[in-house]
Every structure is written in C-alpha cells, then in structure tokens.
C-alpha cells in the first residue's frame, strides 16, 4: 500500500496553489455563490484508514453524484426491469441535451445524464408519495455514508426548481412516451432534492466503499448489493460518469467515477479504495477541473488505474 497520507497531502497542497481552477456552475444561482478556491481530497480503504487533504470536511452540493445512489436503490427495487426505461450507452452529448432523447423515442441513453436520472427517480417514486421517496433516498445515503447527519440543502433544491426549465422539458418529453409514469412535478421535485444533498468528501468517500469492495460495505459490515451489480454499476460509471467528458476521464484517470456540477467527483479503485475529490471550478463538460487533475496525479502515484500501471 503506497503512503497515501503523504500522497494526498502533496496533491492537495499542489491543487490549492494552482491558478487554473475552472468556473463554478452559474446556471444554478446557489452554486454560483460557491468560493472557487475550495479543494478537498479523501481516500478511504477497506480497513477504514483515511487519507485526507484540504477541505475534506466542507459540505458541498453532490448534484449528479446522487445518481449513482439512486441507480443502486432503483435496481434494488425493480431489478433489471429498469433497463426497459433507460439505456446503458455513453451519450456523447451534454448532460441536459434533449436532441438525443427525441431521436430515441423518449428513452434516455444512460442513467447518469439528466433525463436518465429523472427516469430512475420516477421508478423510485412509483407507489410512494414524494416525501416518502425522498426519505428513502436520504436514508440510503446516510446508511452508506455511515452518517445520519447528512441533509438536503433546501436553498439549492429551490434554486434548481426555479431555473430547471430544461429538466422540466426532458421530463415532459419522456412523459409523452410513458417513460415517466408519475406526475412530472412530483418526479422533478424528488430529483431536484436528491441532487441538492450536501455531503463532505469524507462522507462521500465512505458512501462509495461498497462499490470498491464488490458490493460489500466494510464499515457497515455487510453487503449492500451483489458483486455482479457492483461490477455493472462501476462499468456504467466508467463509460458514462462524466457526461461528454467520460472518454477523456477514462483515458486520463482510468477509474470508474461520477462527477457533479457542484464540483465533486466520486471515484472507485476496485479492491483498493473509495475516493472523493471536490473543487467547484468546472471544465467545459461540467466536470471538476482540478478534481480530474488531482485524480490523474493520484493514480499515477498509486498505480491504481484499472488499465494497469
């Protein structure tokens, strides 16, 4: 095992000093207020050992990283029937694109673009009131993070609802094909709220441990999902986890991962560790600019890329 503590602290110090930080998300007003100078990095292994650097305990809006956990939850509820409503292919398009959805008759290309995550949220909502569905998602996040203090930032959720016209268009378009079955306002309400969950790098890295250890959560002491399902979720994270920057992330970092426009990236080194990095400045594809650079440095120094040293 490499000296993770030194590696993480070195990377955090280098990232804090860099001037090229990207631009914070401006289309969600609450996210536009975030200080672009923040940077945190946490690596947690199966023994519970933690290497942390920078703003490891600063909460941030997890945004699309929540889609990993809603996918996990929905698969637990409906199994492979989920794939009748959502595909498993990279989109190659921006995360909120409606063009592809129109071409493919309302079936989203994968569960990590906005349309796909809205369809997955609709599956979780079925048979529940919105408050119940949201409570189930939040309790699952608290369980895998082993922290009951995790909450939803209501200001971010309200900000997303006020400005989420493109997401409303996606949801209504899918409703016209019966891909969405519940009232659109209900589905979007749950979606906006789970994207507005606030977590720290330490909490998110803990939450991802079950994906790093074949579905078994070493800190919780039992399996969350089967090894096969963990492997398949990791595969989708690798191919689809960074919108139209997914191929570049696989090329540069070589780990399954999921980004969010709040500046976080959850990455998985199978059998080795769960990693979360946060830096709110984004690149052109909506992924954390310094977060990707930091992960590239981490895999070079640890040899953790799934494609080899």
Curated annotation (Swiss-Prot):
Q: From the UniProt record, which GO molecular function terms apply?
A: glutaminase activity
Q: Does the keyword Hydrolase apply?
A: yes
Its Enzyme Commission number?
3.5.1.2
Instruction: Please list the reactions this protein catalyses.
Output: L-glutamine + H2O = L-glutamate + NH4(+)
Residues reported in the UniProt entry to bind substrate:
64, 114, 160, 167, 191, 243, 261
Could you state one GO biological process linked to this protein?
Answer: glutamine catabolic process
The entry's keywords: Hydrolase
Keyword Hydrolase present in the record's keywords: the answer is yes
Q: By its UniProt entry, which Gene3D superfamilies does this protein fall under?
A: DD-peptidase/beta-lactamase superfamily
- Subunit structure of this chain's protein: Homotetramer.
Protein name in UniProt: Glutaminase
Q: Which organism is it from?
A: Methylorubrum extorquens (strain CM4 / NCIMB 13688) (Methylobacterium extorquens)
Annotated gene: glsA
């Amino acid at each position: 095992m490499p000296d993770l503590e030194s590696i993480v602290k070195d990377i955090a110090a280098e990232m804090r000093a860099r001037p090229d930080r990207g631009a914070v998300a401006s289309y969600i007003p609450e996210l536009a207020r975030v200080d672009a100078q923040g940077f945190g990095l946490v690596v947690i292994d199966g023994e519970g050992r933690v290497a942390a650097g920078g703003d490891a305990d600063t909460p941030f809006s997890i945004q699309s990283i929540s889609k990993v956990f809603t996918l996990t939850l929905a698969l637990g509820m409906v199994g492979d029937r989920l794939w009748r409503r959502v595909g498993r292919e990279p989109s190659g398009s921006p995360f909120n694109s409606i063009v592809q959805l129109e071409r493919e008759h309302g079936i989203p290309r994968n569960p990590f673009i906005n349309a796909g995550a809205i369809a997955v949220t609709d599956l979780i909502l079925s048979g529940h009131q919105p408050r119940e569905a949201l409570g189930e998602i939040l309790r699952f996040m608290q369980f895998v993070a082993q922290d009951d203090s995790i909450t939803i930032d209501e200001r971010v959720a309200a900000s997303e609802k006020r400005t989420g016209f493109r997401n409303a268009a996606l949801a209504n378009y899918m409703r016209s094909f019966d891909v969405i079955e519940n009232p659109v306002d209900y589905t979007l309400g749950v979606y906006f709220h789970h994207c507005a969950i606030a977590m720290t790098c330490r909490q998110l890295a803990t939450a991802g441990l079950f994906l790093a250890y074949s579905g078994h959560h070493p800190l919780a002491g039992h399996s969350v999902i089967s090894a096969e399902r963990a492997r398949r979720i990791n595969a989708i994270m690798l191919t689809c986890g960074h919108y139209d920057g997914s191929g570049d992330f696989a090329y540069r970092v070589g780990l399954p991962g999921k980004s969010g426009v709040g500046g976080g990236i959850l990455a998985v080194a199978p059998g080795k560790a769960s990693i979360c990095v946060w830096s709110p400045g984004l690149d052109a594809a909506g992924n954390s600019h310094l977060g990707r650079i930091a992960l590239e440095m981490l895999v070079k120094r640890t040899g953790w890329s799934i494609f080899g040293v």
